[in-house]
Amino acid sequence: QTITATHTYILGDNDSRNDARQLCFLQAKQQVLEQAESVIQSQSIVTNFELTKDQMTSYSAATLSVEIVKEDVGLSNGQYTLTLTVKTDVDVDQVNSLLAAIVADTTLADRVAQQQQQIRELEGQVQTLNSRLSVATSGTANALRKERKVVFENIAGLDRMQLVAT
């Protein structure tokens, strides 16, 4: 089953288009993963694994790949916007196999949980940096953008690692 989500990001004065794309992708990805989690829970044998909601969220995110399928740049009330549509394909049988493998291997389960926790913390850092950037002067904006770029790179690195783990 293919699940899609769309999110629109309003660019601030200190946002580049690339920054906006990454910020928008994080939000759209979160939306599509939440929808996928509902599908997985309703159409699978996940209940037999006796997973907590946090475990289900972490393991589902680790087993799914999200891709951008559409990007639109626009103008709304005098501000630039970037709208992304993302998708993930949910093969419940494949997800169940991966979930079973994760649950069966406590080392892998711990590693996946740690990666997802790190991603959530980094996403929180992005939001904090975004808030600071929205009121930053031109003098401090460059340093904040560089810091945010490093956080984006760290998130991407963790995303790549989870694909290897599963």
Regions found by a protein language model. Give the residues of each.
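Pro/Ala/Gly-rich low-complexity, hydrophilic intrinsically disordered segments
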Residues: 72-166
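Short alpha-helical interface elements
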Residues: 32, 49-53, 57, 61, ...
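Structured, amphipathic secondary-structure segments that form assembly/contact surfaces
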Residues: 39-95
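Soluble periplasmic/extracytoplasmic beta-strand elements of cell-envelope proteins
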Residues: 2-10, 83-89
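Short, well-ordered alpha-helical segments
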Residues: 4-57
